[in-house]
């Protein structure tokens, strides 16, 4: 198989992927802060990196995939206080909700899923190293901060210079930071904070800053220097920039070789956000659309491109996925393994090896579906199912999807028992030679999004359209 090329944010270009250890990939992705239900932007991130790890494994790599959980944070503390519940109760509840949402989307669990609160000693150890190396200082307010001007390569990932970043910054008269760009490593506990919000340390009771959490977990679980670090585009600066400064300042080694960032989800060409009121949780979306349709909607756009969310686009994704399942409905795949020498498989692999270009890979699936429709060839049906499976798609029985998932979540959609009752009435009308009534029922069902197919022998199959 040809070499894999990955767009490396650090290099601002595609590069051949060469893992540090032959045949082995270590990858860290910034996960969720568990204080609320996950939104469609989170869905995109986890589906994107789910596909990355699936493709790496398909290429034969031994992958260690780490995706963390942030279970201590200012937002978590505020929400727990607002709700009158403990931090642990809040984070446990939303971790369970997160897992349910991601499972529904067909996202495979990471190999390791560390919780920030499990790594407090490692975070403090890294902070102490940074202090010893001259990168950290304890301010007069008790916080421990990172001194960005001490790190020569600060801004390399984001392409921002310290001078550009300082432009427009104003330092308050009582600001404890030496530089307005300095960021917190350890936040001193405040008297009004609830139980479970702080830990004892040589710097006094407090909790870790967000950035040090990922540095410590990544270095502890994958080593000081690993292959791939990923996350949403919004994390490039300051989070990932700060991770580099912390990790390399503490260890003296290159932190990560390849940085990957997925693009934003947009609504009406604006970034989705709570402040704009164009915010959709995964649960809200799954009330209207089948989970595999949502996954397909994400997969068919290249991960670095903006993803425009709308019901119209999801309806189109449903119709497109229905086309793929329809191709498999009357062509049973054979039981042979995937044939990588076959032309469609080669084009699919070429797309995926070109920076995980799922948009082109999905186009290959439609080319293959056209051939399956034309030939009903079991070998081609197998290729379609197995290639789609590498994207986490087409894993269900076609008739199950076509009858129960393709459009079933639409408002007013007919239930299966209602459809079967109308088919029975149509059969009775045909037996009574009342063909006008039989045609009326067929047209009525089609208007409701149900297509009928009369089979030899007198049976009738149906599917949603």
From Swiss-Prot:
Annotated binding of Zn(2+), by residue: 30, 214, 239, 243
PANTHER family (UniProt xref): CYSTEINE--TRNA LIGASE, CYTOPLASMIC (PTHR10890:SF3), CYSTEINYL-TRNA SYNTHETASE (PTHR10890)
Gene3D superfamilies hit by this protein: Cysteine-tRNA ligase, C-terminal anti-codon recognition domain (1.20.120.1910), HUPs (3.40.50.620)
Motif position, 'KMSKS' region: 271-275
Family per record: Belongs to the class-I aminoacyl-tRNA synthetase family.
Subunit comment: Monomer.
Organism expressing this protein natively: Burkholderia mallei (strain ATCC 23344)
EC class: ligase
Motif 'HIGH' region, residue numbers: 32-42
Protein name from the UniProt record: Cysteine--tRNA ligase
Catalysed reaction, written as an equation: tRNA(Cys) + L-cysteine + ATP = L-cysteinyl-tRNA(Cys) + AMP + diphosphate
Cofactor remark: Binds 1 zinc ion per subunit.
């Amino acid at each position: 198989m040809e070499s894999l090329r990955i767009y490396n944010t650090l290099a601002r270009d595609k590069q051949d992927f060469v893992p540090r250890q032959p045949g082995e990939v270590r990858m860290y992705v910034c996960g969720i802060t568990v204080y609320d239900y996950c939104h469609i932007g989170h869905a995109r991130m986890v589906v994107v990196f789910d596909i990355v790890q699936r493709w790496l494994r398909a290429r034969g790599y031994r992958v260690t995939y780490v995706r963390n959980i942030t279970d201590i944070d200012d937002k978590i503390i505020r929400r727990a206080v607002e709700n009158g519940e403990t931090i642990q109760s809040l984070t446990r509840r939303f971790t369970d909700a997160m897992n349910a949402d991601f499972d529904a989307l067909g996202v495979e669990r990471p190999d390791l899923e560390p919780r920030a609160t499990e790594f407090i000693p490692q975070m403090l150890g890294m902070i102490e190293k940074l202090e010893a190396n001259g990168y950290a200082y304890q301010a007069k307010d008790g916080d421990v901060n990172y001194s960005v001007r001490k790190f020569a390569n600060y801004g390399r990932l984001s392409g921002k210079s310290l001078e550009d970043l300082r432009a427009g910054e104003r330092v308050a008269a009582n600001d404890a930071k030496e530089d307005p760009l300095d960021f917190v490593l350890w936040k001193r506990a405040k008297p009004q904070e609830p139980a479970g919000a702080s830990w004892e340390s040589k710097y006094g009771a407090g909790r870790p800053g967000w950035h040090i959490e990922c540095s410590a977990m990544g270095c502890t679980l994958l080593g000081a220097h690993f292959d791939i670090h990923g996350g949403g585009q919004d994390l490039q600066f300051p989070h990932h920039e700060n991770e580099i400064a912390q990790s390399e300042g503490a260890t003296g080694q290159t932190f990560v070789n390849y940085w990957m960032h997925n693009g934003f989800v947009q609504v009406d060409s604006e970034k989705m956000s709570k402040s704009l009121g164009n915010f959709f949780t995964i649960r809200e979306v799954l009330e209207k659309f089948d989970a595999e349709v949502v996954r397909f909607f994400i997969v068919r756009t290249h991960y670095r491109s903006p993803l425009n969310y709308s019901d119209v686009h999801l309806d189109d994704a449903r119709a497109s996925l229905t086309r793929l399942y329809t191709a498999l409905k009357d062509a049973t795949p054979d039981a042979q393994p995937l044939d990588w020498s076959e032309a469609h498989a080669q084009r699919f692999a070429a797309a995926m090896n070109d920076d995980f270009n799922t948009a082109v890979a999905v186009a290959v699936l439609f080319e293959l579906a056209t051939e399956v429709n034309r030939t009903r060839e079991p070998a081609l049906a197998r290729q379609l199912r197995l290639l789609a499976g590498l994207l986490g798609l087409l894993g269900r029985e076609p008739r199950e999807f076509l009858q129960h998932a393709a459009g079933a979540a639409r408002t007013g959609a007919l239930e299966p028992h209602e459809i079967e009752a109308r088919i029975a009435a149509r059969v009775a009308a045909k037996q009574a030679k009342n063909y006008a009534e039989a045609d009326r029922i067929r047209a009525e069902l089609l208007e409701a999004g149900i297509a009928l197919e009369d089979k030899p022998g007198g049976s009738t199959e149906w599917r949603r359209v």
